[in-house]
Amino acid sequence: MIKKYLFPAAGYGTRFLPATKAMPKEMLPVVNKPLIQYGVEEALDAGLNEISIVTGRGKRALEDHFDISYELENQIKGTDKEKYLVGIRKLLDECSFSYTRQTQMKGLGHAILTGRPLIGDEPFAVVLADDLCVNLEGDGVLTQMVKLYQKYRCTIVAVMEVNPTETNKYGVIAGDDIGDGLIRVRDMVEKPAPEDAPSNLAIIGRYILTPDIFKLIEETEPGKGGEIQITDALLKQAKDGCVIAYKFKGQRFDCGGAEGYIEATNFCYEHFYKTGKAY
């Protein structure tokens, strides 16, 4: 049973400057909730309640958000504004939160390796804040992936088809279709040029990883810019037939850029906030 979830959140958020100069990008509001809260709620819905967050300099707001604010709660006690804290209170009651700091920005693989002391020798999920995923017609994306892990007991990565001209923005996979939206991965390339891409199936920010990934990351040589990419370690797993890509059900918004962030905000406003539905 997977219970642990790792949230790499040490990045600078340069695509949202100047807003992120003094505020973590993970705290950017989508309607009235910060981006990171959507990911934590998705994890809890999937049964993952041990939340580990890899932070960096200037990210104290993340820890403050997932904590009790006694002064604020006393101020709004007995008013209709209490309803706005119901969601975060649920997370505080049902989840445990732990933190570690990534002192150097050396890629996603390095960020995941930094979280190793918090995870231990267990399978775990990874969610990237930039990707907000929703499914209006069934289980959330992480719930779908947890169910697949329970069946296959191997690394699961969420993928989606992208415009072939945009493969240079993603890790891209190729493999053998085994039905039901599943691909047994045999090749994986980090941000290939369109003419070099093995397919147009791109990995998004949802992973379930087996604990051997840590050793594989340690053995990975830094690439461009001194960064250690998770794609390289995943490819080593894939060569042993231990990685399945999943074409998830639902929608994904790239909140790392202005266009996707605005689309996500409009979507959540129309489908959740405006209608009064929980989300």
Curated annotation (Swiss-Prot):
Entry EC number(s): 2.7.7.9
Family per similarity comment: Belongs to the UDPGP type 2 family.
Signal peptide range: none
Catalytic activity: alpha-D-glucose 1-phosphate + UTP + H(+) = UDP-alpha-D-glucose + diphosphate
Main EC class the enzyme belongs to: transferase
Keywords annotated in UniProt: Nucleotidyltransferase, Transferase
Keyword flag Iron-sulfur: no
Native organism: Pseudomonas aeruginosa
UniProt name for this protein: UTP--glucose-1-phosphate uridylyltransferase
